[in-house]
UniProtKB/Swiss-Prot annotation:
<dbReference type="Pfam" id="PF00561">
    <property type="entry name" value="Abhydrolase_1"/>
</dbReference>
<comment type="function">
    <text>Phosphatidylserine (PS) lipase that mediates the hydrolysis of phosphatidylserine to generate lysophosphatidylserine (LPS). LPS constitutes a class of signaling lipids that regulates immunological and neurological processes. Has no activity towards diacylglycerol, triacylglycerol or lysophosphatidylserine lipase. Also has monoacylglycerol lipase activity, with preference for 1-(9Z,12Z-octadecadienoyl)-glycerol (1-LG) and 2-glyceryl-15-deoxy-Delta(12,14)-prostaglandin J2 (15d-PGJ(2)-G).</text>
</comment>
<feature type="active site" description="Charge relay system">
    <location>
        <position position="430"/>
    </location>
</feature>
<dbReference type="InterPro" id="IPR054518">
    <property type="entry name" value="ABHD16_N"/>
</dbReference>
<keyword id="KW-0378">Hydrolase</keyword>
<feature type="active site" description="Charge relay system">
    <location>
        <position position="355"/>
    </location>
</feature>
<dbReference type="GO" id="GO:0016020">
    <property type="term" value="C:membrane"/>
</dbReference>
<keyword id="KW-1133">Transmembrane helix</keyword>
<dbReference type="Pfam" id="PF22990">
    <property type="entry name" value="ABHD16_N"/>
</dbReference>
<keyword id="KW-0472">Membrane</keyword>
<protein>
    <recommendedName>
        <fullName>Phosphatidylserine lipase ABHD16A</fullName>
        <ecNumber>3.1.-.-</ecNumber>
        <ecNumber>3.1.1.23</ecNumber>
    </recommendedName>
</protein>
<comment type="similarity">
    <text>Belongs to the AB hydrolase superfamily. ABHD16 family.</text>
</comment>
<feature type="transmembrane region" description="Helical">
    <location>
        <begin position="93"/>
        <end position="113"/>
    </location>
</feature>
<dbReference type="InterPro" id="IPR000073">
    <property type="entry name" value="AB_hydrolase_1"/>
</dbReference>
<dbReference type="InterPro" id="IPR029058">
    <property type="entry name" value="AB_hydrolase_fold"/>
</dbReference>
<dbReference type="GO" id="GO:1905344">
    <property type="term" value="P:prostaglandin catabolic process"/>
</dbReference>
<dbReference type="GO" id="GO:0052651">
    <property type="term" value="P:monoacylglycerol catabolic process"/>
</dbReference>
Length: 558
């Protein structure tokens, strides 16, 4: 009877993976003797085959889940309509509650029938036995066997806790349960007295901004967190996860962030290969509708690096909602996991981000200054110009206030706090992070990210003549135009390198540098173009085109 109840309440099982190399798939948790017998993958098909009863019950429950999601998103309009029609009176609500209760009882009965179907299936009984044993004792052997199954990630045991590193226990400098530290925007009206009366006056605007951010704004900014989209993408996500596990020996893990969100991760270890780049770990930060199963992790994987992918809060197996604070909390536990559980030194970690993933990448660079490098592909400097682009002009004040208070993705501000090597990849046909049309390459916000970075690091070089030369170079939309502008100013790269190395040897590596202070205008132009070319590479593609492995290069450094 206990096993039947476990089958009724147990998670949905999607797939049984082919047997993998046990040494590479084993967890780093010390092994203890308690374990359950391993499932034989040779006798069962790798795709889980539910019996007819379980299959049909699953279909009914999945359909009910979709209807519930549609009802949830349309509830404000439905309540308004019912109110206008007078259907919210007590005489109408009571019969409706009876219908709803009957429907819930029917769905509970369907769930029980699904449990009976699972109970009669030896594949599911074997799986639930392994899952229960792993929850009781997370030995290396139990976790290895559990990794052979793909199931509802909510039932996966936590592999790493944000407080697990010994350096954080009792530390005042680490994150609290409220979250890690973020850079806060400056007040919109500096110098205004923050009196009680002013607070009352601003209250309606603050309430409106909060409602917009937590309803329409968050879902527009992170469409991958919408349940219906995830439901539609589920077959593709399962296929991508199977590829990472079976072909790349990926290891899935659940991390618990300081805010209580559970973060879904996938690690592919290449340290045992002959390729030297396998010693470096690339942590990938996906876009606003990207998942590690089908996202940018494929680029460093093809290039031979060790890779750690993770899903935003609210995406696929990760819980929570993707607001900036939750995003930073998730990134923090991912980096801690890479250092303290996977065993990578910060100097061997590269942060690679695509599009909106630039926020978490630049936060990690700011918070972990010893990491090796940062690569930002198709990213931007600030969210406000892009948000204003897609909203009506009459909403300008509301949009600006909402972004600054609740969705402040200040990539350039965070990136300027990082002292290490940086590479920006600009898509020359990008249709997402341009503020006008894709053909207008100067409206690409990647340009602003580059200019702000160079102006912070080399303020004496990026004066009027240097800034003008870099802007001309950024207007080039092809390699031929780039080379033409570069040769027009007769940039001597050896001279530029020698100047920078001499300054570094005398004054140290910390930015900002005062190099270029006593330099001629021609010298500043040469140095500005040289630095721009080293920090930004063009890729002739649209926003969503996967970056080929040959374009994945480590950033330049002296």
């Amino acid at each position: 009877m206990a096993k039947l109840l476990s089958c009724v309440l147990g998670p949905r099982l999607y797939k049984i993976y082919r047997e993998r190399d046990t040494d590479r798939a084993a967890s780093s948790v010390p092994e203890t003797p308690t374990a359950v017998p391993a499932a034989s993958s040779s006798s069962w098909d790798t795709y889980y085959q539910p019996r007819a009863l379980e299959k049909h019950a699953d279909s009914i429950l999945a359909l009910a889940s979709v209807f519930w999601s549609i009802s949830y998103y349309s509830s404000p309009f439905a309540f308004f309509y019912l109110y206008r029609k007078g259907y919210l009176s007590l005489s109408k609500v009571v019969p409706f509650s009876h219908y709803a209760g009957t429907l819930l009882l029917l769905l509970a009965g369907v769930a029980c029938l699904r449990g009976i179907g699972r109970w009669t299936n030896p594949q599911y009984r074997q799986f639930i036995t392994i899952l229960e044993a792993t929850h009781r004792n997370q030995s290396a052997e139990n976790k290895r066997q559990l990794a052979n199954y793909n199931f509802d990630f909510r039932s996966w045991p936590v592999d790493f806790h944000w407080e697990e590193p010994s350096s954080r226990k009792g530390s005042r400098g680490g994150p609290s349960r409220r979250g890690v530290a973020l850079l806060r925007p400056e007040p919109l009206h500096r110098g205004t007295a923050d009196t009680f009366l002013n607070r009352v006056k601003k209250l309606p605007c603050q309430i409106t901004s909060y409602l917009v951010a937590h309803t329409l704004g968050r879902r527009m900014l992170y469409p991958g967190s919408v349940y219906l989209l995830q439901k539609a993408l589920m077959p593709v996500l399962l296929q991508g996860q199977a590829r990472l596990v079976e072909e790349c020996n990926g290891r899935r893990a659940k991390l618990l962030a300081c805010d209580g969100n559970e973060i879904d991760t996938m690690f592919v270890d290449r340290r045992g290969t002959a390729e030297p780049q396998g010693q470096k770990l690339v942590i990938c930060c996906e876009g606003n509708a990207g998942f590690y199963e089908v996202g940018c992790v494929s680029t460093p994987l093809e290039a031979g690096y060790s890779v750690l992918g993770w899903n935003h809060p609210g995406f696929a197996g990760s819980t929570g909602v993707p607001f900036p604070q939750n995003e930073a909390n998730a990134m923090d536990v991912v980096v801690q996991f890479a250092i303290h559980r996977l065993g990578f030194q910060p100097q061997d970690i590269v942060i690679y981000a695509w599009s909106i993933g630039g926020f978490t990448a630049t936060w990690a660079a700011m918070s972990y200054p010893d990491i090796s490098a940062v690569i930002l592909d198709a990213s931007f400097d600030d969210l406000v110009p892009l948000a204003l682009k897609v909203m009506p002009d009459s909403w300008r004040a509301l949009v600006t206030r909402t972004v600054r208070q609740h969705l402040n993705l200040n990539n350039s501000e965070q990136l300027c706090r990082f002292q290490g090597p940086v590479l920006l990849v600009r898509r020359t046909k990008d249709e997402i992070i341009t503020t006008t049309v894709p053909e207008d390459i100067m409206s690409n916000r990647g340009n602003d990210l580059l200019l702000k970075l160079l102006q912070f690091r080399y303020p004496r070089v990026m004066v009027e003549e240097g800034l003008r030369a870099v802007r001309q170079w950024l207007e080039a939309s092809s390699q031929l135009e780039e080379a033409s502008i570069y040769s027009r100013w007769e940039v001597e790269e050896d001279w530029c390198v020698s100047v920078l190395r001499s300054y570094q040897a005398e004054h140290g590596p910390d930015f900002p540098w005062s190099v270029g202070e006593d330099m001629s205008a021609d010298g500043r132009r040469q140095l500005a173009l040289f630095l721009a070319r080293k920090h930004l590479h063009n890729f002739e593609a649209t926003h969503c085109t996967p970056l080929p492995a040959q374009h994945f290069q480590m950033p330049w450094h002296l």
